[in-house]
């Protein structure tokens, strides 16, 4: 697991860095294999805090962006968005596999030549 955190237009604090790392690291449980995450934390002029997350895990890519007045709230919201994306992608894969199994059950069986 590789998590890279970048601060833009704000001072880097250990508390925010640790909080973001822990929230993103929890997403690893939904993924198979190693995960590489790029987290960008920024503060805009009008006191809005934005968080952008890119996650690469094998052939999968997930991206989310969130802006709010509180940095911790933005981190929570973006983590929830990524979690929903991962679960949705996994459910889609399961549905495709289940559909293939059902289609195979309805194929006619060749009993051979008589």
Predicted regions and their residues:
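N-terminal, polar/charged subdomain of small-to-medium soluble alpha/beta proteins
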Residues: 1-114
């Amino acid at each position: 697991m590789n998590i890279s955190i970048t601060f833009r237009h704000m001072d880097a604090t250990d508390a925010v860095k640790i909080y973001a790392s822990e929230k993103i690291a929890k997403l690893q449980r939904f993924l198979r294999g190693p995960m590489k995450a790029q987290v960008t934390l920024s503060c805009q002029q009008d006191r809005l805090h934005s968080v952008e997350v890119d996650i690469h895990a094998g052939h999968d890519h997930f991206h989310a962006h969130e802006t709010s007045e509180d940095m911790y709230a933005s981190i929570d919201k973006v983590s929830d968005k990524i979690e929903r994306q991962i679960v949705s992608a996994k459910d889609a894969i399961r549905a495709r596999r289940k559909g293939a199994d059902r289609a195979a059950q309805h194929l006619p069986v060749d009993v051979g030549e008589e």
